[in-house]
Amino acid sequence: MSKRTEQLGHEIQRILGEILQYELKDPRVGFATVVGVEVTADLQIARVRISVMGTPEERKETMAALERAKGFLRRRLAEELNYLRFVPELRLILDTSVDYSLHIDELLRRAAAERAGSPPPQPEDDKPAE
């Protein structure tokens, strides 16, 4: 990735993050975060990795709502990136790396507890309410 495409990717990530947080008012969009943006060398396509918290159904609904809002997102990008002749096409990709890292962390915690001879700790969500 060239320095220019990398800088543009960071700028798109910052702008889209602000738009998702402050401007997008769709109630179907849950807690979504722009994790990263890769821009192709010809600046025609921006692959936007988005992490969404929630159940699989909520994630699917959020991604569908974001797909429907792509026109708005691209228009707002064009306003912010007015120095570009052409704003890249947005390709939204659900990023599950956070979920995967949490899963690996839980497996490591259980393995460490088994080595120590104590029962594995229960995840925060599984503890009974007091």
Curated annotation (Swiss-Prot):
Cellular compartments annotated? Cytoplasm
Q: Could you tell me the Gene Ontology terms of the biological process aspect for this record?
A: maturation of SSU-rRNA
UniProt entry keywords in alphabetical sequence: Cytoplasm, Ribosome biogenesis
GO molecular function annotations of the record: ribosomal small subunit binding
List the GO cellular component terms. Answer: cytosol
* HAMAP family the UniProt entry points to: RbfA (MF_00003)
Q: What is said about its interaction partners and assembly?
A: Monomer. Binds 30S ribosomal subunits, but not 50S ribosomal subunits or 70S ribosomes.
Function in brief? One of several proteins that assist in the late maturation steps of the functional core of the 30S ribosomal subunit. Associates with free 30S ribosomal subunits (but not with 30S subunits that are part of 70S ribosomes or polysomes). Required for efficient processing of 16S rRNA. May interact with the 5'-terminal helix region of 16S rRNA.
Return the similarity comment: Belongs to the RbfA family.
What is the protein name for this chain?
Ribosome-binding factor A
- Organism per entry: Roseiflexus castenholzii (strain DSM 13941 / HLO8)
